Amino acid sequence: MKLIVTIIDDLDVDKVMTALTEQRIGVTRVSSTGGLLGPGNSTLLIGVDESLMPQAMKIIGELAIPRQAVVPYGYSVSVPLPGLVEVSIGGYLAFVLNINHFEQV
């Protein structure tokens, strides 16, 4: 069994969760903070049999896509600076962990 821990932009998380659930892959969403742009991120905890891990990763990769956004230059500093800059947002970060023991009550 594997545990996929993935951090996904909130703009993509609902469609990723829906697609995983439609394939009968269980997923738990944990709101998380971090990053400096957009509405935020969510951390998904996905427990899967090893045979389903490639399918789960494919779904995440197809739906949590990186994209470009234009934001004010200096957006992350306390004093905004004039001008706009293009940055990359979205995508995902995933950790795949081996599970030695699992219990469900």
Model regions: which residues?
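Positively charged, small/polar-rich N-terminal and surface patches that mediate targeting and assembly
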Residues: 1-105
